[in-house]
């Protein structure tokens, strides 16, 4: 998927917070609770409009990045309006080229991102690079089913991925190959197992 297609699809979703917020609420809460329990420096890659930002506690110091200026503007409004002290910085950035030194963060999170960006393997590689050894990389996303009636539906929808901004047949293997990352948890999440909580330890 090309970056300009991603940007266009986000602009078309003027009601993004409302339409996607409810669907993603449970996975976001579960992920934020895990991150809060760990504490430390956190990078959220693809922070979007900041749907997850109110969920972070004072145990963490959060940096958020996104490619979309429009989404970041909305995220900044939320931080200011809600007084979100755990959020320390929001920056415009390409997730394939993160402008941070190696091993900067204790936890690196990407929610609902890897199937809607170009070169997701590069994104995961960068997430691994900026995560400290012994830290965690957490990816929450929809991954393709390999069997059952929904698998056929996902393959059919994949033809429209640039229009929808959603890659329905995205294979989990595309984010599990980095040798620096060891999968330590893979858990289906509501609604209906649509999303997967994928947790890695940084070697």
Swiss-Prot record:
CDD domains: AdoMet_MTases (cd02440)
Keywords for the protein's UniProt record, in alphabetical order: Lipid biosynthesis, Lipid metabolism, Methyltransferase, Phospholipid biosynthesis, Phospholipid metabolism, S-adenosyl-L-methionine, Transferase
Name of the protein: Phosphatidylethanolamine N-methyltransferase
GO biological process, one term: phosphatidylcholine biosynthetic process
Reactions catalysed, as given in the entry: a 1,2-diacyl-sn-glycero-3-phosphoethanolamine + S-adenosyl-L-methionine = a 1,2-diacyl-sn-glycero-3-phospho-N-methylethanolamine + S-adenosyl-L-homocysteine + H(+)
EC category: transferase
Gene name, Swiss-Prot/TrEMBL: pmtA
EC code: 2.1.1.17
Originating species: Cereibacter sphaeroides (Rhodobacter sphaeroides)
Record bears the keyword Methyltransferase: yes
Gene3D superfamilies per the UniProt record, alphabetical: Vaccinia Virus protein VP39 (3.40.50.150)
């Amino acid at each position: 998927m090309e970056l300009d297609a991603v940007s266009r699809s986000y602009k078309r979703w003027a009601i993004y917070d409302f339409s996607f917020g409810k669907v993603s609420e449970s996975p976001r809460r579960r992920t934020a609770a895990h991150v809060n329990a760990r504490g430390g420096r956190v990078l959220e890659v693809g922070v979007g409009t900041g749907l997850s930002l109110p969920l972070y506690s004072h145990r963490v110091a959060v940096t958020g990045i996104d490619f979309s200026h429009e989404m970041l503007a909305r995220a900044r409004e939320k931080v200011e309006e809600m007084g979100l002290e755990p959020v320390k910085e929001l920056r415009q950035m390409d997730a394939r080229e993160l402008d941070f030194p190696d091993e900067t963060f204790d936890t690196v999170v990407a929610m609902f991102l890897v199937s809607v960006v170009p070169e997701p393997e590069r994104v995961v590689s960068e997430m691994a690079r900026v995560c400290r050894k012994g830290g965690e990389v957490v990816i929450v996303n929809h991954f393709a089913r390999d069997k059952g009636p929904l698998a056929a539906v996902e393959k059919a929808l994949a033809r429209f991925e640039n229009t929808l901004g959603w890659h329905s047949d995205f294979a989990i293997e595309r984010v599990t190959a980095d040798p620096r990352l060891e999968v330590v948890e893979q858990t289906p999440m509501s609604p209906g197992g649509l999303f997967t909580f994928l947790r890695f330890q940084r070697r």
